[in-house]
Swiss-Prot record:
It is found in: Secreted; Nucleus; Cytoplasm; Mitochondrion membrane. GO terms for biological process: cell differentiation; immune complex clearance; negative regulation of amyloid fibril formation; positive regulation of apoptotic process; positive regulation of proteasomal ubiquitin-dependent protein catabolic process; positive regulation of receptor-mediated endocytosis; protein stabilization; regulation of cell population proliferation. It comes from Mesocricetus auratus. Proteolytically cleaved on its way through the secretory system, probably within the Golgi lumen. Proteolytic cleavage is not necessary for its chaperone activity. All non-secreted forms are not proteolytically cleaved. Chaperone activity of uncleaved forms is dependent on a non-reducing environment. Polyubiquitinated, leading to proteasomal degradation. Under cellular stress, the intracellular level of cleaved form is reduced due to proteasomal degradation. This is Clusterin. The gene is CLU. One of its GO terms (cellular component) is intracellular membrane-bounded organelle.
Length: 191
């Protein structure tokens, strides 16, 4: 039974993990140099496309203002309901405020006041609802506790009723037994 030589070699080759001496010592930077060059080439190719006249960012003026302003302005453009809170952040925000949230418009001021009043009423109703719910939960807990006590004290009544039912469910069979004691001083008992 002879095995093929290429699957089970008789001897092993020992390879060095170090590069051949004519390449010089290998550093961390050298290992990733081809990858870094590829990224650099991709960035250069993208820069050429971005600087061409056909390509323009829609908010190029915001890119020059700074990171914080840019994020705020972008957020306000997507959701202009926050413009009142952000009105002092940048020029674009102030423009949006004047168009979307016109603070000087009396009709909008009246609507804002109605909204605030409605929110306050909703908050009061929510608090009242929570109070009523808590009260109901307390009463339900007390009622269930009372029912458990009644069940413990008077469970024998329902058991007796179940045992004394005959064929007719509305007719209870009750038997009386009179006990007499041999002692004449103890009265007779009916059970």
């Amino acid at each position: 039974n002879r095995r093929p030589h290429f699957l089970y070699p008789k001897s092993r080759l020992i390879r060095s993990l170090l590069p051949p001496p004519h390449y010089g010592p290998l550093s961390f930077h050298d290992m990733f140099q081809p990858f870094l060059e590829m990224i650099h080439q991709a960035q250069q190719a993208m820069d050429v496309q971005f600087h061409s006249p056909a390509f323009q960012f829609p908010d190029m003026d915001l890119l020059r203002e700074g990171e914080d302003d840019r994020a705020v302005c972008k957020e306000i453009r997507h959701n202009s309901t926050g413009c009142l809170k952000m009105k002092g952040q940048c020029e674009k925000c102030q423009e949006i405020l004047s168009v979307d949230c016109s603070a000087n418009n009396p009709a909008q001021a009246h609507l804002r006041q109605e909204l605030n009043d409605s929110l306050q009423v909703a908050e009061r109703l929510t608090q009242r609802y929570n109070e009523l719910l808590h009260s109901l939960q307390t009463k339900m807990l007390n009622t269930s506790s009372l029912l458990e006590q009644l069940n413990e004290q008077f469970n024998w009544v329902s058991q007796l009723a179940n045992l004394t039912q005959g064929e007719d469910q509305y007719y209870l069979r009750v038997s009386t037994v009179t006990t007499h004691s041999s002692d004449s001083e103890v009265p007779s008992r009916v059970t």
